[in-house]
Amino acid sequence: MSRLSRALQLTDIDDFITPSQICIKPVEIDKARSKTGAKIKIKGDSCFEESESGKQKLNKVEITLQDCLACSGCITSAEGVLITQQSQEELLRVLQENSKKKATEDWDNVRTIVFSVATQPLLSLAHRYQIGVEDAARHLAGYFRSLGGNYVLSTKVADDIALLECRQEFVERYRENENLTMLSSSCPGWVCYAEKTHGNFILPYVSTTRSPQQIMGVLVKHILAEKLNIPASRIYHVTVMPCYDKKLEASRDDFFSKTNNSRDVDCVITSVEVEQLLGEAQRTLSQFDPLDLDWPWSNVRPDLMVWAHEKTLSGGYAEHVFKFAAKQIFNEVPTNELEFKQLKNRDFREIILKKNGNTVLKFAIANGFRNIQNMVQKLKRGKVSNYHFVEVMACPSGCINGGAQIRPTTGQHVRELTRKLEELYHNLPLSEPENSLTKHIYKDFLDGFQTEKSYELLHTSYHDVVSELSISLNINW
């Protein structure tokens, strides 16, 4: 097998997939009937089928990201899929190819390489290499520039816009039907689970606001491309994320622009993959020259590049939307820091706003699939409809404990590591999403706030994969 992200290599797969496995992306299988049995033997890196008529080499099974997104066999399946376009191996190949084109002055085919880095991987890298979070961002910029990157960006502006869109969407939904629960949509593991397991029952509850990763893709492939006066297809956009499922999200057909003939995000690498790349280079992050992150959005550059969004650890959706809705709908402005009440476990918490003795807003945070499954079952029984908004994340403790964050050192417990990352996060400055930059982007590039263009670029739709599966069962093999 070619060298892929070690955490993503297949560990258990049968090379022969038959229709009995009910793949909803079936391929025609040319299988000749045999009167005698056959044995499959594995020799070296190849498999052979042996029978009385001789032996033949079996074709290697190939699974694409699109197959994975459409498959009903798993939930967060990124760890078990042979990924060919979403690995550090592919990233290095593109960078080397780009370097060769520069050397031969093939300028028409040279691509602009843009890296967008989320906050959680910076926390993970800062802890791993024992440096400050802002320092980690600057050393990472130096590392990516040494590989051939042209721009290294923070995802802060995309995080800001995602919160602005989500809060406005909630207020509109609440005013139309205050009894309809709204579920956050920034976690692709949760979205895949909703589409593949519960389909049309759950999808009307899910927010249509794109995740910060995909909003960043819009900013890079539309706004930055326009500023640089180059086609979006000439930009190779790489994001650095805390979660393998972000690779699946970037590969959705919904995030391929036919107008630009380009994906909004071309490649996703993760915290642990950055650590692997540095290990293979036998370097530590701090050994690379620190460089400023780029800020192509305006002439006014912020002093700091790494920010927190509220005090919760996955983008601050529940907290930010709660405060905005309290003010916008009920003219209530919470003066103190919000305190979420822990329920059955630390990954399920709620907060309530009361007015005149009545509960008018009830929000929750549900992290981890145990809590998600319980929440969905309550929705089906009509027992969770009193929640107006639920921030849903597939990983326990949320994105800060994403499945692709750097692993604990020997002898260190996951909870201890998560606690240290939480401390780093809580020491970051707080971002106010409604700022001069986001106002500038809405005004100059999105035709204003709540316009047709802003909705087209900042929102998405979902697919009832459960129904697609039932249709596929009627295929004649």
Swiss-Prot record:
Protein name per Swiss-Prot or TrEMBL: Probable cytosolic Fe-S cluster assembly factor GE22682
SMART domains, per the entry: Fe_hyd_SSU (SM00902)
Pfam families, per the entry: Fe_hyd_lg_C, Fe_hyd_SSU
Residue numbers binding [4Fe-4S] cluster 1: 23, 68, 71, 74
Xref: PANTHER family: NITRATE, FORMATE, IRON DEHYDROGENASE
Family indicated by similarity: Belongs to the NARF family.
Xref: SUPFAM superfamilies: Fe-only hydrogenase
Keyword Chaperone: no
Single GO BP term: iron-sulfur cluster assembly
Domain of life, source organism: Eukaryota
Record: residues binding [4Fe-4S] cluster 2: 187, 243, 395, 399
MF-aspect GO terms: 4 iron, 4 sulfur cluster binding; metal ion binding
Organism: Drosophila yakuba
UniProt keyword annotations, A-Z: 4Fe-4S, Iron, Iron-sulfur, Metal-binding
Function: Component of the cytosolic iron-sulfur (Fe/S) protein assembly machinery. Required for maturation of extramitochondrial Fe/S proteins.
